[in-house]
Amino acid sequence: MFLIWTFIVAVLAIQTKSVVAQSCRTPNGLNGNCVSVYECQALLAILNNQRRTQQDEKFLRDSQCGTKNSVPAVCCPCNAADGQQGNCVNINSCPYVLQLLKNPNEANLNYVRGSVCQGSEQQSICCVTAPQSTAVTTTPRPKRVHACQSEMTATPPNPEGKCCGRDIAVGDKIVGGAPASIDSYPWLVVIEYVRLERTMLLCGGALISGKYVLTAGHCVKGAILDVGTPKTVRLGEYNTTNPGRDCVSVSAGGTDCTDPLVKIGIEKTIPHPDYQPYHFLRKHDIGLIRLQSIAPFTDFIRPICLPSTDYTVNPPSKFALTVAGWGRYLQFDNGTVRSSKIKLHVTLPFVQRDVCEANQKPLRNGQRITLWKGQMCAGGEAGKDSCKGDSGGPLMYEHSKKYEAVGIVSFGPEKCGQIDIPGVYTNVYEYLPWIQNTIEP
């Protein structure tokens, strides 16, 4: 028993927190956590189902447990690593997990790590009464021979080809800050920062070739470096708290799982030479990250296209843009990082630069913010903005069934999702010559 307990501590030590979520009971009798509705995949799927029944609506009402930062909170059941719902209990009360820890191989440990939940006790696990095999049963995917792997070089793929900007997401995507499909936006990356052996996820970016990630200047230069040094990037990520394969239930039945997470070391970071990190206008807020090795091309990892034109000059009618990510950004005033554990996305309206300027709040000295053509704006709708994406992540436009990285998340109002106060993004098209001249073979 002592040996098992040693493994429990080793497996869960990195996951425990000094403050745990409020425990609750779901309408169907499962132990759960009271969390923002945006963080509960199971209930969001019901909420966004236009064909939900009266029984579904009653279940949603009965699941409410208060509010979190003015957002409705719900009693959310936990999910084990294989995607099954379970009870969030102390690990010693879960016979199946204790049995796995008697044989602590990599598969069993990944299952346990992926099943950690925030219960009323620190060492809590999502325990299922009839678990699936730890060899996760997945919804079969068509076998693909990726011809595009040969184009995963340092140079961004030709946007006229088929090797950038395409995802293979199954099913309808949900907008409004809700979970994205497990295989959508496969170019999204999470940047790992390290300080004193502590790893932090502070910024995002977009893979634009086999060797380069596009991100914000403030993610690779300035105050953020006092917090940590960018060391590695995560590719093919979905749930940042799960070190193993991420799995979700699919409507057709079964479970859809990602490939194993890929981490690649950072060879060097390259902020734009004219970026001034402490200037309030955040001009030239763009940077590149060169990776130590070539990224693979898979269903879950592939580059986004660079913009084919400056869409801010003659915007298309009903010009809708998308941001996606884990909502990660560092709040320098108090040093906290706000984030979601799963990939989110939201659709935002384009806002003309002059309208955006007029709606930005003046600085403390009364000075108005003046934007230039290297910046663009989107958002300004209640509860919907780039807080659902990542600092440094891409602002995307879907054109001819391909996504282009037209912007980079730069800055916005202190409080996310305020009406008539759009977020400000770096206009990537303005920097195409710099990107092309900076990339090395």
From Swiss-Prot:
Record note on temperature dependence: Optimum temperature is 0-25 degrees Celsius.
Positions glycosylated per UniProt: 239, 334
SS bonds (residue pairs): 24-75, 34-65, 40-76, 78-126, 88-117, 94-127, 164-305, 203-219, 356-377, 387-416
Keyword list, A-Z: Calcium, Disulfide bond, Glycoprotein, Hydrolase, Metal-binding, Protease, Pyrrolidone carboxylic acid, Serine protease, Signal, Zymogen
InterPro entries: CLIP, CLIP_sf, Peptidase_S1_PA, Peptidase_S1_PA_chymotrypsin, Peptidase_S1A, Ser/Thr_Proteases_Immune/Dev, Trypsin_dom, TRYPSIN_HIS
EC supergroup of this enzyme: hydrolase
Biological processes annotated in GO: protein processing
GO molecular-function terms, A-Z: endopeptidase activity; metal ion binding; peptidase activity; serine-type endopeptidase activity
Activity-pH dependence: Optimum pH is 6.0-8.5.
Protein name per its UniProtKB record: Phenoloxidase-activating enzyme
Species lineage: Eukaryota, Metazoa, Ecdysozoa, Arthropoda, Hexapoda
